[in-house]
Amino acid sequence: MSKNDISAYMSEWMRDREESPIVMSSRIRLARNLENHVHPLMFLSEQDGFRIINEVQDALPDLAVQRLDAMDQQSKYKLVAKHLISPELIRQPASAVLLNEDESLSIMVNEEDHLRIQAMGNDLSLSSLYEKASEIDDKLDSELDVSFDETLGYLTTCPTNIGTGMRASVMLHLPGLTIMKRMNRIAQTINRFGFTIRGIYGEGSHVYGHIYQISNQLTLGKTEEDIIESLSEVVQQIINEEMQIRERLNRHNYTETLDRVYRSLGILKYSRLISMEEASLRLSEVKLGIDLEYIELEDFKFNELMVAIQSPFLLDDEDDRTVNEKRADILREHIN
């Protein structure tokens, strides 16, 4: 898989930004349900599910629809790897995703709620992402009968989403805080203020490559602007702590950190078999070394490699190499 091949897999909003070494991406997600339809988790029939898909498609004709029942498993999991759909959407019998041209907008149909509107970007621009998601929300609201209560707000399947129905989240690369074992303390602290830390694919997912998703937990009684402002403040505090820890590692643990970086670089350069878990760890430590200016690598794309080394992009019926072997081959080709 060449560097051009990797870039072809990526949505534009997922690409690396040199000016943002810690913030990988941001997302605004709005949960909505439709009146006169059974909720997806309450035995939604395939017939009703496909009827909802058609209604949403008619309301948003400018977006491309992909029905998951028409896709093979590998194609579905590629969408998961690119953060365009959730693993939960795959498990629904009648589900779909609508995407705009650059894939910065994704509308999941018949996941936990009838609609999950997602706007995504590769910086900390939560307010502009909310405006983007809100524009789609307004279009749907003008065409469809969306469930809304004057007292409670938007009615959702999960009680924690009732109110604005909004989840704001930011993906951060936090190797310093992880190495110094600070993440549990941070998780406990922000939890008291209504925020949570999850893995790379949200609730219940594993942490790979020292990448964490920070998001709000509750929406009832808060405005969208309140949630965005509070999350932005929390994220900035975490970024500041990560920068302080990196400075400490550089000053007081220089040799140990340098050794960690070069060991990982050597494994990526020379391994012939490597698992997803180890590959993401080694990529993270090499990225830390680049950020601390210990090493220079030409055209090192952390975000893109973290997607490209996932199994859905490595499976090929015409190639008898194992996934771990192909992953190692890709990394050797790109780490120079």
From Swiss-Prot:
Family note: Belongs to the ATP:guanido phosphotransferase family.
Superkingdom per UniProt: Bacteria
Residues the record lists as binding ATP: 25-29, 83, 116, 167-171, 198-203
SUPFAM superfamilies the record matches: Glutamine synthetase/guanido kinase
Gene name of the encoded protein: mcsB
InterPro entries: Arg_Kinase, ATP-guanido_PTrfase, ATP-guanido_PTrfase_AS, ATP-guanido_PTrfase_cat, Gln_synth/guanido_kin_cat_dom
Protein name per the record: Protein-arginine kinase
Enzyme Commission code: 2.7.14.1
Claim: Kinase is one of the keywords in the record: yes
Organism: Staphylococcus saprophyticus subsp. saprophyticus (strain ATCC 15305 / DSM 20229 / NCIMB 8711 / NCTC 7292 / S-41)
